[in-house]
């Protein structure tokens, strides 16, 4: 007999069910069940995913929900016990009307009825019952509760629901009975008693409900309230229940009859996905309860609509004034308004200078005609696809932001390829000039809508979203929900804690998980020690087994960082919504992909801090010079800008701050904006391997070759190297006569590695190329290169738009360095490490950073004639409101004249003594009293005097002090400087660093400057000029110590952030050194050390070979240092690995005859691999080049995607420990496989 599960929970019943949608549906397939319901607690989070997965497996999906029903009104939120605030009820969708009603009920449960749970009430049920089938739910349902109370109460409840839902109401019966053998396995007696009481209730409810339902003509169905898949999943489920409460479920107790009130547990262990046969046996005395589930399934025929768009519409103002209009009239008016905006843009955007650039591209045509032809093409496609409203809505939002002084980025993604978007001001980079294609944005040969993402100043982002809400209606706009899942490490820790396992053992297992995104299965596969632990230790094996079951479970909800949904009518007409914790804005119940698939418009409002920095800087520049700088109108050939990049001074330049980018800028020496675009596209996995060739070709050190002459005009800009996806489209068009739309289809197929489509495209390309007179073998070669490249090629439109931001930041730094660095410091003053680096950058540019001053500093860092003035707001412990109060008073009544004047004019409700002391120690009152200890004593005395006086004045008591204040006469300070306990310079300097995050007015090394010549010290500023293999003595201050454990050797090592007066740098202390010197590794300690210089990679790397506390240095220590120094100088510390390649290092170094030793194998996770990771790894391989073969394995979602075998060009040193240790210090998503050791 077939049975349909109608009461089922997935992991979207958060922390209450372990079933993933995929495994849940697979179980139904295994049991040959034709239909399946999903009824998660109070939400529809998983509905779309469930629906699609069922359809893919030829199973009828039944979308439902186990709702919480308030016992009285949903608005009644009295402080009752959690168990008494709601009853359960199952609703299942029959059709589209039922789906809309269920969406609305689930939404209102959150927006109106939330109290412990999202709750509806009977009033809402009456209003929205159409199209729904109702089941009476479990023991927590009101009908089950009535059955336990009396037959009269039961009959009354059944009749109420029967009257409302008619034949679509079914009473529900459940029985979670276990065998005596299973009951005997319960660990504690109270659990057994709990089970017996539960079964007694279930039997009583079952009998009563079946009896009364039969008398009333109500059909009954049997369900099993599924919360996990298999019988042995009960323990994993119980662990999940207790994750949030952090309550151990295993504790040693003397009396097993006493329940643990904190432990969450289900009374039976039968809440698994039972087979139809098991259910038929369980309800053999009432077989109709099984067959009735088929009747329910037969009535549920909901088909979700994935075609219709529910996008908002745009109504021009002229039409709004008219009042009534047809949809055709509205759309025509919108199209006309769009064309009008474009006409205005043609007049204002296309300056003679810009038209001159286009004329260079098309010398035989009038440039304005070129623009208008492109616009006509775009307009035709946009209007035919019904996209006018979409573009106007985005234009309206961006236009409002700009009108209100909120900076918006120059574009993002493929939208920068559209002339229309440029004319509308949605983007700020002209696409024809830079060979950007509209077809990359909207392909006329595809139906899908494009995304237009908006970069917005961080500060103004919330205002822009609020405008969208106000413009389109609060009920039409929502954030997008996200789901936080249990990663492997977290699952192991949660399971270990819940099973009350010793923390040491839990940590031992967790540390075997190499990174945040590794799975337990992959860790077991790659780590032999973990496998052995699993085999040898039963307790560890149980933790691992349970964690594997819970890995990937949803742990919490959040909201998407950028995505906002805008609908043309109330969202609840189409999707369910909820209210996120600590948010006033509603959120969708569907995550990003599902919500877009059901026709919702997603707009990404991405907060970009760089735009805020640009805004702050340009405001300061305008205030100082009267010049209003805008990214769109900057000269793109500024000599200062390119000179700055040639020097590699990329700190504070958008997308170019990493060490790898710094080296790339220095080596490439870009001298055109197009090369800045290329830099952003090259520094990524794939094309990164071509960086040396790109550099050499630019500088004439490598020949530029083309597979066919037709490719030269396409690839000339990038020196014969494919860098952009658009170049694939161009090559297909030039060689094989593809339209740009067809070229985009080809690009997508290549990128997705769609084998079936690629077979067709290869034949099409080669055939058309042959017809165009191209040799078939050449065509095949070119197609192969295109196919290899397209999987990692970059979107040129995006690279160009972001390249403009890069150029703008470089321009500001090169031409207005004080204003730019002040803006960066203002926007990053919460990041102490970043502030320190920026101040060092200012010093390297000979720009003094001045301490805060009570009369000159404000909320922001400010560029002054002398340098950059430190912000009062950046002083630790001094809040925004205090600084605002200080500045407001200063602007209103003039500068503060003295300590007394400052205190007298202070708002005592906002300023505290502790904050005054912080301001003093930061240097803010040096203008009045440079002795900080004396200044604090005076301020405290004045503070007590004036705060007392103000209190007395408020009570109407007139004293000498209040008279004194009223006449502004000086208060006599009785503090004698001789009686003040003065702190040492070292203490004051340490306090300054605590408050400012940096040593600003001095450095601890100042005190030992006189010693440095006698210690033969080399300072950090001189490291860059030293050759490979140099040995240096140096002195540094330890700023930060980060201790780590190697996943290979499981030994401690440290990463030090150290500094001297000139610079800061990172210094690794490997495990052998760490064991010897760990007692010295303390912050704020001055160290005398010997370092070695390694230049085998693209950047300078340092290793520490010896160290001592500087305070302990004496003749003996100096002698010891000299001996170590001489020994290292006479050793060949590093082997030279450079080959002559026209002055450039080879990408990889190949040894001709590697020794027969096992290869090192490294697995790289493509889900998290970034271009910077490969660049760093490449440098490490060069650094540790040797004779031992290295294999790279690339994985995605734990599946092996590709590999580079040991017979490739990758070789490292035989002793790989240092190589592996250095990988540990990076964030490369790498795992060292078993063959590595």
UniProtKB/Swiss-Prot annotation:
Family annotation (SUPFAM superfamilies): PHP domain-like, RuvA domain 2-like
GO-annotated molecular function: 3'-5' exonuclease activity; DNA-directed DNA polymerase activity
Reaction catalysis annotation: DNA(n) + a 2'-deoxyribonucleoside 5'-triphosphate = DNA(n+1) + diphosphate
Broadest EC class assigned to this enzyme: transferase
Subunit structure: DNA polymerase III contains a core (composed of alpha, epsilon and theta chains) that associates with a tau subunit. This core dimerizes to form the PolIII' complex. PolIII' associates with the gamma complex (composed of gamma, delta, delta', psi and chi chains) and with the beta chain to form the complete DNA polymerase III complex.
Function text: DNA polymerase III is a complex, multichain enzyme responsible for most of the replicative synthesis in bacteria. This DNA polymerase also exhibits 3' to 5' exonuclease activity. The alpha chain is the DNA polymerase.
Protein name: DNA polymerase III subunit alpha
Source organism: Chlamydia muridarum (strain MoPn / Nigg)
Gene from which this protein is expressed: dnaE
